[in-house]
Amino acid sequence: MTNIRKTHPLIKIINHSFIDLPAPSNISAWWNFGSLLGICLIIQILTGLFLAMHYTSDTMTAFSSVTHICRDVNYGWLIRYMHANGASMFFICLFLHVGRGLYYGSYTYFETWNIGVILLFAVMATAFMGYVLPWGQMSFWGATVITNLLSAIPYIGTTLVEWIWGGFSVDKATLTRFFAFHFILPFIITALVMVHLLFLHETGSNNPSGLISDSDKIPFHPYYTIKDILGALLLILILMILVLFSPDLLGDPDNYTPANPLNTPPHIKPEWYFLFAYAILRSIPNKLGGVLALVLSILILMLFPILHMSKQRSMMFRPLSQCMFWILVADLFTLTWIGGQPVEYPFIIIGQLASILYFMIILVILPAISLFENKLLKW
């Protein structure tokens, strides 16, 4: 009798994806973040579902309903803070996952990579709309500022913004539709994740050396299942430390003030995971230019397969590229810091320099260094 695991139409798919999947024998802990992102997505969908049972998407009651969840619902505070901080963990894992892809040249699987970039956009859109739902000051003004950016689009801008708002300002219609989109997007993300995995399993995983590893594969289970479980335990440990000891560490105190269209907060800023893009947006004095730079700061990831000039796939044996990669990481930290600072000297000029450096490293310096390293191979 053949194993049901290998014959049953549905279980067979799971078997080929998570059990008998041939995986490189040398993939490091940097390859754990895919599974961690899956766990983050599951946590977010489950906690979000339970929050949606008690939340009301109406301007009059939204803020009160969140307070009600935290005070009156059994373990409501836990569900709410797991959802809020789960988003932060999601983005930490996302940034590390993308960084791993850049460092080890995983972007040469360009279908997998491009679906990944679309996923990044989808998660960012979901997180932005989720931030609006508690209807605090920063929710309202964040929504106003970010949606307003679309008015920079020539000809259709103003009409587009009013269409998204469902009126002439961010109001009840906006909140209701943001809740609807925030609910549906994670399921679209789940479908995209399946496509992401489908393309990945067509080629198999990359590995730290960047070399073809077909001659040295091991089964995913038990080797990488146990490794992923360790990663998951560490993720949940960090998340629960954050949730139970300092749940508001990454939030904005302004969001504990109900939304007031007549009172603008002194510093409007998004959640920490958008600050790098926000800094790039603010560093350009022109509105349309800023919006383009904001979109390109993420969209530029799609250019990496084209900009790859090196004869080697991974950066493992390319010290000059490694050095530039870590300068890029430091630059992103700088942009994140600048995004949270007021628009005044010296932060403006630092932000502008960091933004220029960001695009320069990706578009010019890294490809140039790769070509130079190719020359070094001949010496």
Curated annotation (Swiss-Prot):
It comes from Tamias amoenus (Yellow-pine chipmunk). Heme b b562 binds at H83, H182. Binds 2 heme b groups non-covalently. Keywords: Electron transport, Heme, Iron, Membrane, Metal-binding, Mitochondrion, Mitochondrion inner membrane, Respiratory chain, Transmembrane, Transmembrane helix, Transport, Ubiquinone. Component of the ubiquinol-cytochrome c reductase complex (complex III or cytochrome b-c1 complex) that is part of the mitochondrial respiratory chain. The b-c1 complex mediates electron transfer from ubiquinol to cytochrome c. Contributes to the generation of a proton gradient across the mitochondrial membrane that is then used for ATP synthesis. CDD domains: cytochrome_b_C, Cytochrome_b_N. One of its GO terms (biological process) is mitochondrial electron transport, ubiquinol to cytochrome c. This is Cytochrome b.
